[in-house]
Curated annotation (Swiss-Prot):
Binds directly to 23S ribosomal RNA and is necessary for the in vitro assembly process of the 50S ribosomal subunit. It is not involved in the protein synthesizing functions of that subunit. Keywords: Ribonucleoprotein, Ribosomal protein, RNA-binding, rRNA-binding. InterPro entries: Ribosomal_bL20, RIBOSOMAL_L20_CS, Ribosomal_protein_bL20_C. This is Large ribosomal subunit protein bL20. It holds the Pfam family Ribosomal_L20. GO terms for biological process: ribosomal large subunit assembly; translation. GO terms for molecular function: rRNA binding; structural constituent of ribosome.
Length: 134
C-alpha cells in the first residue's frame, strides 16, 4: 500500500480557514492558529446575534407601534389588547409598517381596537361583540 502524506488536505483546510478570515485585522488574517480561533469565535457571535437580531427588530416594531398609537390616545398594551378582543390577528412587523406607510389603515385598526375595548367594557362578553360587529 502506498504511503499517504497529508500535506494536501491540511493545506486545503488551512486555505479554507484563511479564506474565512479575510478582512480580519493583524495576524488574525494570515496566521493559521490565530485565524482559526478568530473564525470560530466569529461563528459563535454570528449564531448568537442571529437570535439577538430577532429580539431587536421586535423591540423596534413595538416602539414604532407604541409611538403611532399614542398619537391616537392609546397605549401599546391597550391597543394590542383591543386588537385581540376584536379578533384581529396582525403581526407586529406589519403593524409597524402600516403605522409608517399606511396611516389611514392603521387609524382604522386603532378605531377597531378602541371599539372592542369600549364594547367589551360595557357588554362584557366577546360573543356579543362579534355578533354586533358582524
Amino acid at each position: 500500500m502506498a504511503r499517504v502524506k497529508r500535506g494536501v488536505t491540511s493545506h486545503a483546510k488551512h486555505k479554507k480557514v484563511l479564506k474565512q478570515a479575510r478582512g480580519f485585522y493583524g495576524r488574525r488574517k494570515n496566521t493559521i492558529r490565530t485565524a482559526k480561533a478568530a473564525v470560530d469565535r466569529s461563528k459563535q457571535y454570528a449564531y448568537r446575534d442571529r437570535k439577538v437580531n430577532k429580539r431587536n427588530f421586535r423591540a423596534l416594531w413595538i416602539q414604532r407601534i407604541n409611538a403611532a398609537v399614542r398619537e391616537h390616545g392609546l397605549t401599546y398594551g391597550r391597543f394590542i389588547d383591543g386588537l385581540t378582543k376584536a379578533g384581529i390577528e396582525v403581526d407586529r412587523k406589519v403593524l409597524s409598517d402600516m403605522a409608517i406607510h399606511e396611516t389611514e389603515a392603521f387609524g382604522a385598526l386603532v378605531a377597531a381596537s378602541k371599539k372592542a375595548l369600549e364594547y367589551l367594557k360595557d357588554a362584557g362578553t366577546k360573543n356579543e361583540f362579534e355578533a354586533a360587529v358582524n
